[in-house]
Amino acid sequence: MTKVKAAPEESEAQAEGCSEERTYKELLVNLNPIAQPLASRRLTRKLYKCIKKAVKQKQIRRGVKEVQKFVNKGEKGIMVLAGDTLPIEVYCHLPVLCEDQNLPYVYIPSKTDLGAATGSKRPTCVIMVKPHEEYQETYDKCLEEVQALPTPL
């Protein structure tokens, strides 16, 4: 008796995983009331690409504690916050911190997708992307669009 490889079952599982992905509009249902300025669908995709490139160069800060520590030290970059994080008290002080330090920040709809963009299986509620010459063009485009978003009052 030999083992039979389960290749057909794996491909079925992958197909099911693809069907479980939620659309941008479905993700908007779970947003917090403080999730402003919110990135558009196109900007969200650009940010994910920039984050993936930054991870390869190890130019990101991940998590509330680490991001807050380096913002207070004066590090510059784009702060990307997940709009579906609960309770909001976990990270509601970060936009104020960004405004004090003149850092651009933007909300995206899903913490799960934000974590996946970093190559992690865990959801992540905040990431700071630092500039680097390897992906400077992508970073500059994202920075320009994030700064063009209207800031909340």
Swiss-Prot record:
Any one of the GO CC terms: sno(s)RNA-containing ribonucleoprotein complex
Record has Translocase as a keyword: no
Modification type Phosphoserine: residues: 19
Location relative to the cell: Nucleus, Nucleolus; Nucleus, Cajal body
Positions bearing the Glycyl lysine isopeptide (Lys-Gly) (interchain with G-Cter in SUMO2) cross-link: 3, 5
Keywords tagged on the record: Isopeptide bond, Nucleus, Phosphoprotein, Ribonucleoprotein, Ribosome biogenesis, RNA-binding, rRNA processing, Ubl conjugation
Biological process, per Gene Ontology: rRNA pseudouridine synthesis; snoRNA guided rRNA pseudouridine synthesis; telomere maintenance via telomerase
Sequence position, cross-link Glycyl lysine isopeptide (Lys-Gly) (interchain with G-Cter in SUMO): 5
Family, per entry: Belongs to the eukaryotic ribosomal protein eL8 family.
Functional description taken from the UniProt entry: Required for ribosome biogenesis and telomere maintenance. Part of the H/ACA small nucleolar ribonucleoprotein (H/ACA snoRNP) complex, which catalyzes pseudouridylation of rRNA. This involves the isomerization of uridine such that the ribose is subsequently attached to C5, instead of the normal N1. Each rRNA can contain up to 100 pseudouridine ('psi') residues, which may serve to stabilize the conformation of rRNAs. May also be required for correct processing or intranuclear trafficking of TERC, the RNA component of the telomerase reverse transcriptase (TERT) holoenzyme.
PANTHER family per record: RIBOSOMAL PROTEIN L7AE FAMILY MEMBER
Protein name, per record: H/ACA ribonucleoprotein complex subunit 2
Species assigned in the record: Mus musculus
